[in-house]
Amino acid sequence: MTSTRDRSFTFTIDRGTYNDTQRSNAAGAALQRQIREVVVPEIDKYRFGKICEGAKTTVTGKVTKANAYDTFLTGATTLIENNVPLVGSCAFVSSDFYKNIKEDSSFIRNGDMSQEILIKGQVGTIDGIPLIIVPKSYFPENVEFIITNQAATTSPVKLSEYKIHDNPPGINGWLVEGRVYYDAFVLENKKSAIYVFKTAE
């Protein structure tokens, strides 16, 4: 496996736009914001794309608050039939699916944390599979949820390097540079450990 995603960024911060107390934190705060708002979302979107691309089972249908729980159980059952252990599995769900499953009376009655959901309004787990809410923009088009096992995908970040240069030549302030070398791979013999549900276009 050879990583193909070699990404970099650079930006400057003018020292004159910050007062004395802000200056010491300005470059570090800007770098953290860049990582949080740009780098991490890009890597996550790429990973979800690769996971969906490599899935053995992709189902298209419609999710409503009346069938969200049953739709999810169908996916979990598919993994069980593919000899995928539920231990180590997780589900990434869109905000729409999250809303539908929270309103599905079957889930509220039968979910693993049904009492906590009734009391606290929290989404919990289904058959030991944790539900992780993901912004729809992170998923490929029309994907509602993904159930996968951690053994199915490897996603190395081979190089993650960030530097802040204080007053480099020609700049009165900071030059911030970063480079990330990463990829994501679905293992050929683990494709059956991924279940993707999409809505009809």
Give residue spans per PLM region.
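Intrinsically disordered or highly flexible coil/loop and linker segments, enriched in small
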Residues: 44-48, 85-88, 185-186
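Residues forming anionic-ligand binding surfaces in small-molecule and nucleic-acid pockets
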Residues: 5-18
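Alpha-helical scaffold segments that mediate packing/assembly in large oligomeric complexes
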Residues: 15-82, 195-201
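Sequence/fold signature of self-assembling virion shell proteins
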Residues: 1-7, 22, 104-201
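Extended, solvent-exposed, turn-rich assembly/linker loops in the middle of proteins
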Residues: 53-123
